[in-house]
């Protein structure tokens, strides 16, 4: 990786962390409802989106809600989604980011369906899913 690419990757990680910290403050103030923090997930989210192309799709789970930021989604849209406000709904085609799924792994069939369809139609597109914490983690 070049120095410029490393800087961009770092910028994305900081963007995700700052958003996450602000969203947690809003949650504690009662401005948004439930919010699942994504601390320590920044490198995974930033690295994956950095490796994906613009035409590739992202299917985030609840801890990856800030991931749309690195695709250009306005922060207010994500915050409004957590409030359940209609202005928090987005067209997935605008950023190739599917709606956030809170129940763990419920977005996997959607990603698989899109992957199958694009494989048949295009053949070169990637659909990335994120499972957050808790999915297939050992207990104990």
For each feature predicted by the language model, list its residue ranges.
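Active-site-adjacent structural elements in enzyme catalytic domains
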Residues: 6
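Charged, compositionally biased N-terminal leader segments and the immediate start
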Residues: 1-2
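Cofactor-binding active-site loop characterized by glycine-rich and histidine/acidic residues
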Residues: 18-140
């Amino acid at each position: 990786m070049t120095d410029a690419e490393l800087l961009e990757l770092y910028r994305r990680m900081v963007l995700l962390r700052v958003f996450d910290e602000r969203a947690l403050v809003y949650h504690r103030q009662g401005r948004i409802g439930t919010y699942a923090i994504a601390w320590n997930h920044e490198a995974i989210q930033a690295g994956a989106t950095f490796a994906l192309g613009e035409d590739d799709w992202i299917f985030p789970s609840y801890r990856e809600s800030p991931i749309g930021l690195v695709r250009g989604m306005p922060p207010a849209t994500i915050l409004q989604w957590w409030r359940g406000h209609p202005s928090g709904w987005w067209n997935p085609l605008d950023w190739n980011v599917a709606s956030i799924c809170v129940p763990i792994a419920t977005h996997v069939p959607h990603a698989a369906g899109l992957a199958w369809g694009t494989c048949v139609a295009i053949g070169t597109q990637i659909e990335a899913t994120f499972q957050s914490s808790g999915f297939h983690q050992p207990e104990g």
